[in-house]
């Protein structure tokens, strides 16, 4: 397995889908974090501009009423349900995770394909029982 020489904010997480699922399970069940820390992570901090993924040089055109960033997680609000989500993109490897704290359910998906996120939406929608709103933005 490739191992980076230095840790970074992106692209240096090396794990398996099973181990990452254990991490998500611990998060959903409040293990390893103070309750107030977990609440803060799950609270929308910034609304997403659906028209712009990397918006450092322009003002937002419109802010989403359903997609936000919490602390370290994307947050989707859909029909009164909040779900946490995140994705990884290392070129030819893609990953996606979605978890719903209220129902304590989630899905972790790792692929070894540049087109891995193309199959993620139907898998995530089926597993979570709701439409995933962020895939148009993630692309």
Feature-to-residue mapping (PLM):
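Catalytic loop of the DD-peptidase/beta-lactamase superfamily, centered on the K-T-G motif
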Residues: 1-139
């Amino acid at each position: 397995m490739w191992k980076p020489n230095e840790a970074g904010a992106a692209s240096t997480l090396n794990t398996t889908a099973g181990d990452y699922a254990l991490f998500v399970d611990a998060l959903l069940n409040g293990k390893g974090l103070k309750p107030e820390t977990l609440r803060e992570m799950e609270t929308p901090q910034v609304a997403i501009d659906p028209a712009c993924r990397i918006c450092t040089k322009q003002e937002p055109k419109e802010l989403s009423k359903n997609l936000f960033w919490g602390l370290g997680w994307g947050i989707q609000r859909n029909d009164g349900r909040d779900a946490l989500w995140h994705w990884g993109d290392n070129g030819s490897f893609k990953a996606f995770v979605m978890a719903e704290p209220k129902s304590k359910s989630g899905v972790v998906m790792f692929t070894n394909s540049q087109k891995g996120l193309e199959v993620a939406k139907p898998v995530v929608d089926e597993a979570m029982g709701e439409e995933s709103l962020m895939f148009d933005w993630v692309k």
